[in-house]
C-alpha cells in the first residue's frame, strides 16, 4: 500500500464537517492507498472540544481516561493515563493549536475511520482503500513522541512472519 499525507489549512473549532474537508483536500485516491488523518482534525469536526476556561484539565482527564495516575510530586505536572488501551499522557487531550479549547480524542475513532473509508470508497469508486487516525504518544523513560494509530481500517495492520527465515 502507498501512504499519502495531505496538507490542509489549519482546522479550527468552526470547522465541523469532516466530509467537506475531505472533499476539499483529498482530490484523488487510487487503489491500495492509505489516508492518514490526525485525531485532532477528527475531534474538532466531531465537536470534541471544551473551552479551557470551563474546566480544569485534570478534571477532564479523569472524565476521559480509563485509568489515570496523578503523582502529586511529579515535577512535570504530567498525568499518565490509559485510554482505549494506550498509555498516553493527559488521556490524549490536547490544547496546542486549540485556540482556547481542549481537544479530546474522538468518541469512537474506529467508527469514524469506517465512515471515512466508506465515503472514500463511494466517492472514488475504489475497493482497497485504507484509513488511519493518528495521534502521538510518549514512551516511558524516553524523550520525544512517537506516532500512534488510534484507529485503522481497510488493511491488515500486521503481517505474521512466524515460520519464515530471519
Where would I find each of the regions flagged by the language model?
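N-terminal and secondary-structure boundary signal
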Residues: 1-166
